[in-house]
Design a protein with these regions (language model features):
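Conserved beta-strand hairpin/beta-sheet module of binuclear metal-dependent hydrolase folds
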Residues: 1-53, 150-167
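Short glycine/proline- and acidic residue-enriched helix-loop micro-motifs
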Residues: 34-43, 110, 175-178, 182
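Metallo-beta-lactamase
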Residues: 22, 41-76, 83, 88, 92-142, ...
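Short acidic/His/Gly/Ser-rich catalytic and metal-binding motifs that mark active-site loops
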Residues: 24-29, 98-100, 171-175
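Active-site loop-helix segments enriched in His/Asp/Glu that coordinate
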Residues: 75, 82-83
Length: 186
């Protein structure tokens, strides 16, 4: 499954939805993910595929991102968090509480190496209107993890774009009610 990040440009600032896998996981998977996870998961990205170089292709620096919203705190969605020290991070309170309490949610074991940095985390409860104008909304889609959230962006002309992250991998999965392979509760 590809790991994607989404950049939203708004008049009041930029929001990045998910930061992907840490670049170290590509060159030292055991050191970054541990032997068990490195054996199960193969990182296929190439140098330059990480979120910061991709922003560079758009002429942007990490410091120009005002908000980072993590869909959840698995390594493939928050691995690049540390590269955005000036951003405000928007994470569901239930997600952060579960992540910081090992064993609290059976089967849920995010790595503190990916999310536990001295960053400006703003914990949200439920739906959150990022810019206060209804154009960029975070909303809970619990199931994959205790506090998974998705992103809805008003795209204009009555159309919305939804970034579901690991709540639903494809449109076909949604149409057929196929659940994600990894579930905390469903």
């Amino acid at each position: 499954v590809p790991v994607m990040s989404f950049l939203v440009a708004h008049p009041r600032g930029r929001l990045l939805f998910d930061t992907g896998v840490h670049c170290q996981a590509r060159v030292d998977p055991i050191g970054r993910m541990g032997p068990e996870r490195a054996k199960r998961l193969i990182v296929k990205s190439r140098e330059g595929d990480d979120v910061v170089p991709q922003l560079g292709l758009l002429g942007l620096k990490a410091g120009e991102v005002r908000y980072v919203a993590n869909s959840h705190l698995h390594f493939d969605h928050c691995g690049g968090n540390e590269f955005f020290p000036r951003a405000t991070f928007l994470v569901q309170r239930a997600e952060m509480e579960a992540a910081r309490r090992p064993g609290f949610a059976p089967g849920y074991n995010p790595s503190p190496l990916d999310f536990d940095h001295p960053l400006d985390y703003q914990l949200v409860d439920g739906e959150h209107d990022v810019f206060g104008d209804g154009s960029v909304i975070l909303f809970p889609t619990f199931g994959h993890t205790p506090g998974h959230q998705s992103l809805r962006v008003r795209a204009g002309k009555g159309a919305d774009l939804v970034c579901a992250a690991d709540a639903c991998y494809t449109r076909e999965n949604m149409d057929r009610d196929v659940l994600p392979r990894i579930l905390w509760d469903a």
